[in-house]
Amino acid sequence: MTNPGPRYPAAQPDPVFPQRASRPATDAPGASRAPAAPGPRAAGPPAPGREAPGGGPELTGRRRAGLLLTLILGGLTALPPLSLDMYLPALPEVSGALHVPAATAQLTLTACLLGLAVGQLVVGPMSDRFGRRRPLLTGMVCYIVAGIACAFAPSVETLTVFRLVQGLAGAAGVVIARAVVRDMYDGLAMARFFSTLMLISGVAPVLAPVLGGQVLRFTDWRGVFLILAAIGLLLVLVVLRKLPETLPADERHSGGLADALRTMRGLLADRVFAGYLIAGSFAFAALFSYVAASPFVVQEIYGASPQTFSLLFMVNSIGLVAFGQLNGKVLVGRVPLDRVLGFGLSMSGAAAVALLLMTSGVFGHVGLVPLAVGLCVLMSGMGLTMPNANSQALMRTPHAAGSASALLGTSQFLVGAVASPLVGVAGERTAVPMALVQLSALLLAALAFVGLCRPWRARD
C-alpha cells in the first residue's frame, strides 16, 4: 500500500517552506491578518527569490528542494491544459457518439473552462485564509471523482455538468501554484520562475493532444477521462508527500467572504493591476479561441486525421514553450518586462491579421501549412505575453497573493469561456470566426496594456 505521506500531530500546522526575508506591511483595503504568534520565528535557510548581497535576486536557494517544488508546481499548472487539450482530438468523436452537433460538443469544453474560471475565484481567497495545502488537496480529490463521472456520462448533458465540476475542482491546482510562487519569489526572480514554470507546464499542451490521439487508437473518448483521473490521483499522492505549506499561520487572512471581496475590490481599484489583468485575459482568449476551433478547422476543413492534428498542435505548443524560455533565460533582467510584453502582443497581433487574410480568401485557397505557420507565430507570441502579464500583476500584490492569483485566473478563463463559442458561430466549414476572434481579443489586450498600464511612465 502506498504511503500517503508524513503524518503531523494535530496540534501542529503543515510544514512551512522558508519565506522571503520580508513582506510589505500594507494590505488591500479591508483585509485583515491573523494575529502573529508570540515570540521570534526561527530563521531558516535563504529562500528562493531573496535578495542576494549584491542586490540581485538569489534564484537557487536549496537546489534540490527548488527543483522538486518546480516539478510539483509545474504539474499542478499543467492540469488545466491537460484537462482541455487531451480531450481535443476526441471532440468530433464525442459529437458523433452522443448524436449532437459540433457546437454542442464544444460546450463540454466551455463548461470545463467556465469551471476553471469560477473555481479559482473561490479557491484563491480560501488559500489566503486556510493555507495552500488543504484547499489544494480538497480540490484534487474532487477532480478525480469528476473525471470518473465524465468517463461514464450517458449523455452530453451529463458530460457537460461533470466537465463543469472537473473544471471547478481542477482550478485549485493552477491558482494555488501561482500563489505558492508569490509566497517564495519576488521581482525578477518571480518572472524567471514563471518562465521556468511555463517550460514544465508547457509540456502538457505539447503532449496532451498527442496522448489523446494515441488513446483514441485503443479506446474511445471515455478512456481519456479515466487517464485524467489517474493523473489527478498521482498529483494528490505527490502533494501529500512532498509539497510543504508556504503560507505561515501568522500571515494568513482571518476574515471571511466579506473580507475576501474587499480585498479583491482593492486589487481591482489598482489601475495598473487591472490593466495587466485585462491584457492577460484577452491574450488568453485569443489563445483559447485557437484551442477551441483548431480540432474542427484542421480535421473537418482540411481533412487531417486526429494524429496529424495532434502533431500540428504539438508544434505550435513548442513555439509557446520556446519563447517562454527565451523570455525567462535571456530577456528577463536585460529587457524591461513591459517592452517584452508589448512585443509579444504585437507579434501575436500580426499573426492574427495574417490568419484573417488567409482564412477569408484574400490570398485565394491557402493550404494547411501556411495556416499552421500563422498559428505557430501567434502561439509563440503568447510565450512572451502571458508570463510577463502575470508577473507584473503579482508584483503589485504581495499582501494577497491567493486573491490576486484567483482574479488573474478567473478573468483569463472566464473571458476565454465567453470567446470560445464565438469561433463556431458560422458553422464547421470556415475558419474566419477563429481568426476574427483572435484579432479582436489581441486588439483589446493591447488597448488595456497601453491605456491602463501606461508602460512609458514610472510606477509607484
Describe each region flagged by the PLM:
Residues G54-R62, P244-L277:
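Juxtamembrane intracellular "pre-TM" segments in multi-pass secondary transporters
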Residues A97-H99, G131, F152-T158, A169, ...:
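Helix-breaking motifs and short loop linkers at transmembrane-helix boundaries and internal kinks
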Residues V118-E157:
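Conserved MFS/SLC helix-loop-helix module at the cytosolic interface between two early adjacent transmembrane helices
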Residues Q120-G131, F323-D338:
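Helix-to-loop junctions at the C-terminal end of transmembrane segments
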Residues R134-A149, R339-L355:
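Structural signature of the two symmetry-related core transmembrane helices
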Residues C142-A149, E157-V165, V369-L375:
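Paired small-residue
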Residues P154, T158, G187, S195-R241:
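Helix-loop-helix hairpin linking two adjacent transmembrane segments in secondary transporters
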Residues F162-S201:
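Cytoplasmic helix-loop-helix junction between adjacent transmembrane helices
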